[in-house]
């Protein structure tokens, strides 16, 4: 008998339980870790999507509407390049993966009430933000000129609806499924069409959207009529697609849908009802349509047109009309902004090509209209006849032989006749009918306005390379460009004599008695050069005077006078913004770096706040795409985000510091400019007198003298006299200023990014990468960087004398600008620093970073003119970018803002007065107090309409009566506005209303700020109060002198409070151009408070002088 087999030896039950429990815990821990990491990635991906201009996808994920179809996202952003698309899709794929894992993140919330980071801004123009519901909704559009072949009518493909991005997205809102339908034509760009009977709503709103090509919902006239029933037969309305798709889902998916339903019902409680309603577009062209339908659709038979015409898809017919409006942009969006001038502005260029309004704008140009070409040809013929080729040119009597004349005349012009005047030194001509921009208290020596009309014989050329002559005559008047033209033949003349430009400029500077005046009101040419100024510009393939090297302008200018009025305040803290502050006038620096006409609209300092917001998001997208493509995997991740400027951290007290160690933001809040005046004067001294010093910024100065200069800057911040100082001492002091800043000029957050660009990004990609990184800098850092780079480019222009190339300068200045040693000490542990010190030599990483900093600064100095321009790629997203350029309205357009059709601008002004007193009656309810170092009360109020700008209010007590304060505001602006360059009343509308233009100075080389406002005042108010109201307006008689500012709202309310004192309340909401929304949040309120303080101090200073006079 065989023995039975023995069972194998088994472990004890306790060991088995222990091992299985350990394995289960490992699995649970791994799943928990993976889930936590996925949640972190999802949160950072949503933050990046909002910062890079894709907030709609972050909203969809938070609403549990993921996963989405990546291919539809690519089609929606077809204007982006491949790298940017990959960066976007990488985040969306991460969210799709997290959605499959059923991960949820908390809804996005602001960190604080001071932050305006949630301002809606999307790169794509196919999404719109509903301000009432705080939701993003998609504007579904057709492409009538689809490259795909249309299906045969009646075929199954002809009635298919657009497929949903995913099956889960089909069940967006079960409670509202009976109201959602999306109707598309056969010409829609749809690549993933579902089978017949499947419905795919792509919107979360309960609306029926049928959009036509190239239009936005509610912005086009094509939506005013409904299609006929026969036309509607080509569309399929399927309301039960949700139910059919839901039946095919598994049990788990049904549970998910139930959670969506609960979430949707939860959101509906906080969600405002949609106001879009039923919107149906015009009929969509399809195959087999008859002649009757074509007439009904107002279609144009393209095949019957002339062969010379160009078939351009999505071109809407617009009438070509001439206008005298000025514009800061060289092109306009096809979709006009709601607040822009109602009629399309079309400007044509004549053969002269030199007139101020002679730019060629193709907006509204209809390529299918043959009469357009006939009109243009006829106008060209008239231009040729008006400028005969045998025109005789005259030169002035005091012309110096061997130099090019600064003024030329033709015909029978006589310099001493026709009641005209010629400024031979500046090249400007004041003919009959000249309008001058002159302050109210102008001297009688200035020219009077003439009433006769100008003729062709009075036309002269105005040169942009003559220092000191902007649009002003020798008497300080502003030229009337609308009544003056420039000879077209001068283009050809300049083409042959462009080599003599430098000689002319040096000669003019030598004999010029104008120089840089410290007072704009006493200056012959008070307004600095601006990119909007008209100047002589030759053809695109020729060199322009503004594009010449900076050495083409004279660098020798007289020093600022040192006789500064004695200060009567402490000179620190809030007293830093007193009305007797001295401001630097640096005209030659501004004129030498003035952009050419064809690049004016691309300058960053000309963009509106909404455009800057969109440009910053696009820059983050571009920078992320480049760094993720070229840097190592451990050098990037989801940590890319826009720098957060409103962190809740304890801000150090800088009351005991004035210059060194003070952040740039504090300088802006104190003085309105990011660089202290004494530092600007040091740069001017080096530029005017020390560029010939060999080894400038390389040779060291004397420490004792440098310390004395530092103390001089701290004690006298308004005006430091550097006369007789050593160039090397001043240069070393300038390096120490940037070294002592609390953070590097490129900021702590972005300094490493700048270094990575020059370590990993290829050379041909570095320019666009560095431009994107610069756009992520705070405004004050970017402005100072631009000023410094332009200054250093002037230093390198004199390389033959000082032997300082861009690389040599970079070696000397890179450690101070990047704070390389400081960053290493802060980012390294004490053990690592001790090991490096013991070795006695830097490691390879430090060497690479130093080399990258040197190469980067040298590259930025050489390419400084290209770094501060809008990228050309922004033109691809034209509809979403150009429509953000909010321009001032005309008087007629202001009247149309009222609900009454017969209203004019007077009704608009009366509404403004009523709204002001409504605020006073409600005691400014809803305003939030804001701390400031100024001796004034500051508060703000958020406004939902218009650009992302707050309404600020500053209140102070002034020792004067309301009538005196109103007079000071209207007639004596130069007594309290230290930045004022010139002012002029353009037109008097009535006894209390006028069009007023004034120009304010900016930190060189940035252009001046040009204001054209409609202002009205009231004196017969209750309790003896007075009010002054201002709003920017577009006026054809106001020439553009600088960057045109858009004042949305400005109000002065003056209330008596007894004892000869008054309470001044100033409210302002303005777009100064070239600033991000964060700048207005951080700094603009302080500037408003500083303004009322300067108004008060103008009376205090006057009373003090009166008492001193009486005591004598």
Swiss-Prot record:
Residues 146-203, 318-350, 405-459, 512-574 are annotated as: Disordered. The modification Phosphoserine is found at residues 112, 115, 155, 343. Residues 635-657 are annotated as: Polybasic cluster (PBR). PROSITE patterns: RHOGAP, START. Residues 320-348, 409-423 have a biased composition (Low complexity). Gene3D superfamilies: 1.10.287.2070, 3.30.530.20, Rho GTPase activation protein. GO terms for molecular function: GTPase activator activity; lipid binding. Residues 37-104 form the SAM domain. It is found in: Cytoplasm; Cell junction, Focal adhesion; Membrane. Residues 898-1105 form the START domain. Residues 183-193, 520-532, 547-556 have a biased composition (Polar residues). GO terms for biological process: actin cytoskeleton organization; regulation of Rho protein signal transduction; signal transduction. Residues 437-446, 534-544 have a biased composition (Basic and acidic residues). The record marks 698 as: Arginine finger. It is a peripheral membrane protein. Keywords: Cell junction, Cytoplasm, GTPase activation, Membrane, Phosphoprotein, Tumor suppressor. Residues 662-868 form the Rho-GAP domain. Its main location: cytoplasm. GO terms for cellular component: cytoplasm; focal adhesion; membrane raft. Disulfide bonds: none annotated. Residues 296-468 are annotated as: Focal adhesion-targeting (FAT). The keyword rRNA processing does not apply. Functions as a GTPase-activating protein for the small GTPases RHOA, RHOB, RHOC and CDC42, terminating their downstream signaling. This induces morphological changes and detachment through cytoskeletal reorganization, playing a critical role in biological processes such as cell migration and proliferation. Also functions in vivo as an activator of the phospholipase PLCD1. Active DLC1 increases cell migration velocity but reduces directionality. The SAM domain mediates interaction with EF1A1, and functions as an autoinhibitory regulator of RhoGAP Activity. Interacts with EF1A1, facilitates EF1A1 distribution to the membrane periphery and ruffles upon growth factor stimulation and suppresses cell migration. Interacts with tensin TNS1 (via N-terminus); the interaction is decreased by phosphorylation of TNS1. Interacts with TNS3 and PTEN; in resting cells, interacts with TNS3 (via C2 tensin-type domain) but, following growth factor stimulation, TNS3 and PTEN are phosphorylated which leads to weakened interaction with TNS3 and enhanced interaction with PTEN. This is Rho GTPase-activating protein 7.
